[in-house]
Regions:
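Acidic, surface-exposed loops and disordered segments
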Residues: 1-140
Length: 140
């Protein structure tokens, strides 16, 4: 797909089909996302794929609002920034996440950026508790 077409087609989707994402497709999307540029070529971003429905359901409940729709996604990619690699780890993670969204679109997958850095945890957590830096990108 042409890049301009990817830009036109890219949108946030919050309802997903229940069919699993093929491993080969996931591997391609991840490989393409990890080719994204990073500060000083530090590659300080790590991607973790979750396909276990119980784990995805727990991830969906990590926040009081704004992430419940994750529960029905067949796959979730956690975008994690390594704060020891560079002071620009957040920026690197955002660049990689954006590349991941575009790669998913190119592969015919739906996705949605769910940002949780510094967002409140569940109500039963201690006051001031926050979710550590992580982006959740459900894919289908």
């Amino acid at each position: 797909m042409e890049f301009k077409e990817i830009l036109r087609r890219r949108r946030s989707v919050r309802k997903y089909l229940s069919r699993p994402v093929e491993r080969e497709v996931l591997d391609t999307v991840l490989r393409e996302a990890l080719a994204a540029p990073s500060s000083r070529n530090s590659h300080s971003t790590h991607l973790r794929v979750v396909t276990d429905p119980e784990t995805i359901a727990r991830i969906a409940r990590m926040r009081d609002y704004g992430s419940a729709f994750l529960e029905h996604a067949p796959a979730v990619v956690l975008v994690e920034g390594d704060r020891t690699a560079t002071d620009l780890w957040r920026e690197n993670a955002a660049i990689t996440a954006t590349a991941l969204l575009f790669a998913a679109t190119d592969a015919g997958l739906a996705s949605c950026w769910v940002h949780v850095n510094g967002r409140p945890c569940l109500k039963d957590q201690p006051d001031g508790a926050q979710v550590p830096f992580c982006l959740f990108l459900p894919l289908l």
